[in-house]
Amino acid sequence: MAKLPKITSLLPHSRVVSGIQPTGIPHIGNYLGSLKQWVQLQEEAARTPFSKCFFFVADLHALTVPQDPLKFRQARLDMLAALLAIGINPQKSTLFFQSDVAQHSELAWLLACSTSMGQLNRMTQWKSKLHLHDHDDLSFLDASATSSTRFNLGLFSYPVLQAADILLYGATHIPVGKDQSQHVELTRSIARSFNSSYKEKILTVPDIILNSSSSIMALCQPEKKMSKSDINSKNYILLSDSTGEIRKKISRAQTDNIKGITYGDSNRPGINNLINIFAAISDSTPSDIAQANASCSNAEFKEKVSSAIIRCLQPISTSFNEWRQNRELLRDIAKKGAEEAVAEASSCMHKLKTLTGLSVY
């Protein structure tokens, strides 16, 4: 994989774009791994001349797996409420539902027509969704009835729609975690290829803003990433969890019998995970957290981690519940955000249609 440029600060005329699927109320891993960074970028963009953030609920992407319509409708509103609760401000950022802006799908088709099957075949996300190995390809599905029944075009072409999400708004910066950089690389490749085909630099090739925080792992099984879809609810902490639920889940988190708090020992994945959570919440480093708590017992350290999480999430949880109860206001915010997004997206598509010969106006 080619090395992507990393950006640590915004310059004038910057545009930040990112989305999150409405697969349930976000957990602390979502917050520390990406959403907290969104708020920081929003504030930085507000201080940077002619800069703008576009954040959206990626509901079209969520349809690559079956959804119950009633639950899905609520999940979309819950995610919007969660984004507002963590500090995304519609006065500073454009906040909207992806499905409310038809130009996402329109641009995805244009990009799909210049994206090779080989490029998509090399993507790892659709393989991980089907529990395949990174080196597997489409031919493997012919021999795997189980995988092929769960495989659809939407899942395979997911990265093309994601590229459209980014390129539609002239994104200059994309905040991502370490495991998502492959899709940004593909987006950059698609943009360069499209520009080359039409001999005009019409699509902006975005740079990456890499979140340096360590991945947050499952509390009871720290060898795997924290996930809302985990059947064991003890493995994750939701932004809406109560104080009691947070303390109970942290107290039951996997640790070990080794005395003292140390960081980096591969034999202590549970302690490493708790240190990473504590460090990300307190804007510190794992080594500093370990050093400051070196003499603590595991139980004492868990209590400190619980208290730090509660201080961080309690105002978010309160705000989330307030937003969640005001469905009409949520719809108004989404509608206004969609109008802003459509205005931007329409301008981009008009230029692209003119360039590709689709427009006669």
Curated annotation (Swiss-Prot):
EC number per UniProt: 6.1.1.2
GO biological process, one term: mitochondrial tryptophanyl-tRNA aminoacylation
GO MF term list: ATP binding; tryptophan-tRNA ligase activity
Positions occupied by motif 'KMSKS' region: 225-229
Statement: the UniProt record of this protein carries the keyword Isomerase: no
Classification lineage: Eukaryota, Fungi, Dikarya, Ascomycota, Taphrinomycotina
Reactions it catalyzes: tRNA(Trp) + L-tryptophan + ATP = L-tryptophyl-tRNA(Trp) + AMP + diphosphate + H(+)
Protein name (record): Tryptophan--tRNA ligase, mitochondrial
InterPro entries: aa-tRNA-synth_I_CS, aa-tRNA-synth_Ic, Rossmann-like_a/b/a_fold, Trp-tRNA-ligase, Trp-tRNA-ligase_bac-type, Trp-tRNA_synthetase
The organelle targeting sequence, given as a residue range: 1-16
Residues noted as binding ATP in the record, renumbered to the chain: 21, 27-30, 177-179, 225-229
Species name: Schizosaccharomyces pombe (strain 972 / ATCC 24843) (Fission yeast)
UniProt-listed HAMAP family: Trp_tRNA_synth_B
Recorded family membership: Belongs to the class-I aminoacyl-tRNA synthetase family.
